[in-house]
Amino acid sequence: EIEFWQDNELKKISAQKEIILSSGAIGSPQILQTSGIGNSKKLKDLGIEMVHELNGVGENLQDHLMFRPIYKVHGLNSLNKKINSLFGNLMIGLEYVFNRSGPMTMGASQMCMFAKSDPSLELPDLQWHVQPMSMDTLGATKNHDFHAFTPTVSNIRPTSRGYVNIVDKDSRTYAKVKLNYLSTDHDRMVAAKGLKLTRKIVM
């Protein structure tokens, strides 16, 4: 039997076969913990009845920290000013409607590249995603008012580990997420090398 919230109403359904939990790196451990699956001491402290002890639930959280250096360009046009203007957005929309081309047909990044932070490595550990635009933060409502591009670089094999822990028994309460970015010497070194290599490529 499964309990879930829908429109602020707690509902129940039954499954005749297996249940597949697919709520991502944050949601899945949160659901497991509120369901009584996880570290027995942590769950007991929150008043949650233990169903199955599994200490690894919520542990070993891994993520790729992305550094977003921004480079101004001269003599070239980025998408910044076009995206910032009403007329520019109109032209982008018309180009897509009539030609199925332009910025609306692009993916999140227009170029991807891999490299090694250390030549002795068997496989690359650095990845770049390059965008022909720039902004202060991802998801910002306004791009910069100058032409620039963003070569985002990340360590794709970080050694830093974080965790996801619930704070109470209510599954609607956001869990505590600790990412622990750059908590190891290795990750700090790779980050520095990634930014240094980015400058070398661009400049």
Task: Write out the residue ranges for each language-model feature.
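Structural recognition of the beta-strand scaffold that forms the well-ordered cores
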Residues: 21-22, 52-53, 165, 178
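Glycine-rich, N-terminal phosphate-binding loop of Rossmann-like dinucleotide-binding domains
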Residues: 23-24, 35
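Core beta-strand elements of the Rossmann-like FAD/NAD(P) dinucleotide-binding domain
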Residues: 8-23
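Residue-level detector of conserved, well-ordered beta-strand and adjacent loop positions
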Residues: 3, 62, 167
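C-terminal catalytic lobe of FAD-dependent flavoproteins
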Residues: 46, 101, 108-203
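Mid-to-C-terminal "cap/lid" subdomains and adjacent gly/pro-rich loops that border
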Residues: 29, 39-144
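Short, hydrophobic/aromatic-rich segments at coil-to-beta transitions
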Residues: 1-3, 148
